Amino acid sequence: LIFGRAGLGVVSLGFGGPLGPEAPLIALVAQLSSRLSHILRVTQARVVELSVAGSLGVLFGVPLVLAGIESEEKSKNRNIGQRIVARGPEILAAISSLFVITKLLPEIGIHQFTSVNSAEVGFGIDLIWVALIALLAASLGLAIVRATPKARELVVSKIPGGAIPAGLLSGLILGASAVVTPLVLFSGHHEIQEILDSTIGIGNLLVVVALKTLVLIACLAGGWYGGQIFPLAFIGAGTALVVAELVNSSATLGLVAAGFVAASAVGIRRPALALLLGFVLFPATTWIPMLFATVIAVAVIGKRSAELPSH
């Protein structure tokens, strides 16, 4: 079972599935690390949390362990030194993932998104576009998260034969969409840079975003195994480019960063993690729009939390 899910994830990604690699990695690491809790004398949930965060840090090229993890021994009365000691396991896990990134796998590096002709987001009209993009991207992320389990229920109830026919049908949808545009294939991480570099028009961008949304829901509903962080980020980035083209804004990269963070934050319900990924993958000139987008995403999550399915 441990390696079955990981193998399914590899197959899904290898055949162009519009999903991220984090889900099979999480499944594998969580199962393996849970068996170490009695050796380390730490609760099973704690070991899994730290191990998953450490492995994701290596996957994304940045130590993520300290992002959004709360100590199980937290207390308002502790001083700074005691808090640091209590967070010792997170700190060690972060150092371990940083060592792997820099020493053992230096070639993965950190490759930031770029846009040659992009200007910085100003404090005037550009922030209005940031707010609009963040709201649109967060709403799209929310719609996808809500639609996926419903689509899965529909597939299970309406398609006879179990997993194989469901997988074939979703594969046909993915293949047909890829004929229209290959940008819908794979997670969307590298494809974000492609749409930043391309000169495709508004109509084509809308088609790409719509098809990416369709294949993401279809493949998850059809039993393909993978993560949603970068597919959602791609959808948010594509939405931002559509708005940037419509309003003729030159602050392309900042707007894309806002869409990236807003959509992924709502999708994974971890705004701090989405923001940290944005900080790593986008230059410092885009940090203000990303912070603004995170605030909007948090508001959307808070308002619609009851409607979001649990992880």
Region annotations inferred by a language model:
Residues 1-311:
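Alpha-helical transmembrane segments and immediately membrane-proximal extracytoplasmic
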